């Protein structure tokens, strides 16, 4: 296999175990089996958005090439597949992973990637701190305008959680760092012994827990962004996705105008545009540069609120994912024709596969 270093200067990495690695905060982190298999089976994903001639790190180059062809129905591959044994011999100008964490940084150093291409330990620590759910909680007040809902409180004791329960009998507790669908507990009225054990463990391991009122969710969706080196935030597009028990299932592939039409059946497009502009002007992400996504949801109005009971409200910042998301993947596959609409799913039988079907 011939590699022309002068033409290929960016290395892309799909490390879906990133969220769990952030929570562990270990340099010698070992991902759970499901995370390792997801990375092995879908390591080709960066080829969907990489530039021609870029490298994509995979475990098996032949398997990645085959999986890419199957997923894209024969779309021409423009990248070079590489394995970890080749990294020390590559001439690179930049590295672009799914998300930065301490474990990935140390892996790449062990594989021979130049430290100057990687964020410093201090920068990785900053990314981890910004990935704390408090970042979303701090952004929320600047997004709370008419037609919106949402609050979150960081609790550092059982008593603080019980105080929130006295205000909101139905509560959602969230680990400060966790992957989709994990680290969530739904509390109805009081803390059980099971919940107390989970909570005390979390208070010890992560220093606290996020407490949020339970909302009657109608629809999940998100907005995808990229932040540049100078801190400028650019909007990339809407992400209309589906979850089951908090875990990602699939994304709609459609033009931005088609997605706006779909979401306008629930809430005002003008409201969405205002929220988008407030995110761009209000969110501060330090030295982080790269893709990120903000999960949102449409909820039925809580009868305790002083608004019409039939009203649908926007929760504008459920979570901030300071990494690439499946929404970004969907944007890289979205059609240019308003009449073409598909759905992208991650299916699992004996392995993970990216499937694209007509909607």
Model region roles, listed by residue range:
Residues 1-6, 87-92, 302-312:
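Short, basic, low-complexity termini and linkers enriched in Ser/Thr/Gly/Pro
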Residues 151-152, 171-195, 222, 245-262:
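Glycine-rich phosphate-binding loop of ATP-grasp-fold ATP-dependent ligases
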Residues 206-208, 235, 246-313, 352-359:
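A long amphipathic alpha-helix within ATP-dependent nucleotide-binding catalytic cores
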Residues 169, 194-247, 297-301, 310-317, ...:
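Phosphate-binding site of ATP-dependent enzymes
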Residues 225-278, 321-347:
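ATP-dependent carboxylate/phosphate-activation module, predominantly the ATP-grasp catalytic core
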Residues 155, 165-186, 207-217, 294, ...:
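ATP-grasp fold ATP-binding core
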Residues 4-66:
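N-terminal "leader" segments that precede or initiate the main folded domain
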Residues 3, 36-45, 57-160:
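Conserved N-proximal alpha/beta basic substrate-recognition cap immediately N-terminal to
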